[in-house]
Amino acid sequence: MASSSSLNNDDARIPVNETSPLNTQPQQDFSTIIRSGPRHSISWGFPGRWGTVIKIDLAEYSGETVTSSVPLNDTNAAPESTSPAIPLRRRVHNLVRPTPETDDSHKLLGEWRATAIAGNDISSSCLYTAGICSQKAGQYSFISLYLVALVLYLYRNIYSEVGLALPLNGGAYNVLLNCTSKFIASIAACLTLVSYIATAVVSASSAIAYGQNLWSGLDPAWAVMALLGFFCLLTLFGLKESANVALVIFIIHIGTMTLLVIMCLYKIMLSHDSITMFVKNWQTESLQNVPIDIYYGFGLALLGVSGFETSSNYIEEQGAGVFPKTLRNMWYVVSLFNPLFSLLSLFIMPMSEIRQHRDDLLAAMGTVTSQPPSSTWLNTVISADALLVLSGAVLTSYVGITGLIRRMSYDRCLPMFLSYTNRWRHTNHFIIIGFFVVTSLLHYIVRGNLESLAGVYSISFLSVMSLFAIGNMILKYKRGTLRRSIYASWPHVIIGFILVLVGLIAVIILNLPHITYFILYFGITFLIVMLMFSRNRVLKLLIYFGGPQKWLDMLNKHYKKIEDRPMLFFTRTDDPS
């Protein structure tokens, strides 16, 4: 049997022993290929069950088409076509996707729709952050909130650099996957999953709590599940429809917050006691001492940045250059409203009353500033706005977790069926419906005990932010040649990481009773992901112990199905070994 030939990047002929696993297919005329100039696709035939592997030279590709290749078995490594020439982009798409169809009607999100999806979550924080922060920081709350704005300013470039260098869904999971290992990346993914699940339940419950101010007969147990179900259906309709709803909610919320700021300023200008009220509040005795109060207030104020990381989990659905703009817009909102409301409250309400309204400080400010004084119309408007925007935070969780789980299934960290789309709206129905079931069950289990869930999601998303900064540093070291138009300097990354880590320590100290819940939720999620991640090893173990023949046949069939999926393997030479 004559030996076959393989070609390197310089088009030189290299003899290959006939026992080599890389045997080029006999229909390839390599002399013709050499004489005709550069070639862009060579099929390597792997004997046995491996099918056909196609070598695609992306560096030399200049827009021309490449000849198709016929697989050796029934694997979908190469697309079926009657045409002798298939575009390279379609070839790569068919290698990655389970089906060759593309949705040409898919439209990428613009700046404001992309901002609204994540912005509803982070902008809803002004409804509760000022009140919560005042419990520890008191009259110094606005200082703690400005420190949080500084952290987000640093993280704008940290997130932007990673998103532009690796524009794929997944957030911290994405950057750690490309710079470390699947195991480490899965830890970040589990933290993100826990954060989204807890955020959805807490936001839905808080929204219904505000809704009870408008309708006292509202049953919170069923209303929360109905709200989760509504956004499940909305997400099933598609991201474009969800983004339109999110944009409407975002505009209404920003308008309502602007109205409240105007009414507060009007109240301060009319009242002769505003300055006196501020001086009296400022002279209130601190709970411990000023630095400690500001520190614990800073930890609680970091609750207001939940949602900032969500934009990186649907970056593939955003248009070119949109991702950094979404981060900038969210930073504007948080930096403007959160510290401002905390400061304005010192002019119109005594400190004792501010601390009494821990969860509804803005509604109380609306009552104080309503004109005429006896009316409560502004309180009603703020309650309605809170119902809307906290509901929008539920939508943020749906969109974020869909992008993350879809990415994990593509990377085979989770079952591939989760990434399947329906023919109706081309959405990932298994992920969306599964998330609805999990959040509804969690709401039923906790039965309104939101303190533990709030502590869980606080620790989770701050841990994710810390891992994102670590991923940025590893990216600079390992993948420094990747192109990106925004670059976060080393001092910015290190300072941002330290500030988030310091805030995380404060949150852990303040939530020590809830650490057990965090470990429980994270442990269950991590166990499920690890079982999926190592499912082939689990199947091999079950096959080893034996059993009925039908059982073994089913296990072997499932094992072979997992192993036979097509994949892309990038190599610098013609020899993948």
Indicate where each model-derived feature is located.
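Selective recognition of specific alpha-helical transmembrane segments in multi-pass small-molecule
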Residues: 147, 151-154, 253-266, 324-351
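Helix-loop-helix junctions that connect adjacent transmembrane segments
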Residues: 251-307, 313, 346-358, 364, ...
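C-terminal membrane-solvent junction of multi-pass transporters and transport-like membrane proteins
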Residues: 417-430, 465-515, 541-557
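Hydrophobic, membrane-embedded alpha-helices of multi-pass small-molecule transporters
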Residues: 110-127, 282-328, 382-393, 571
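Loop-to-transmembrane helix boundary motifs in multi-pass membrane proteins
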Residues: 182-185, 217-226, 317-340, 376-377, ...
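Membrane-interface loop-to-helix entry segments
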Residues: 223-270, 327-331, 396, 453-467, ...
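Membrane-interface "cap" regions at the ends of multi-pass membrane proteins
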Residues: 2-129, 157, 177, 287, ...
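Extracellular loop-to-transmembrane helix junctions
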Residues: 86, 105, 130-191, 198-227, ...
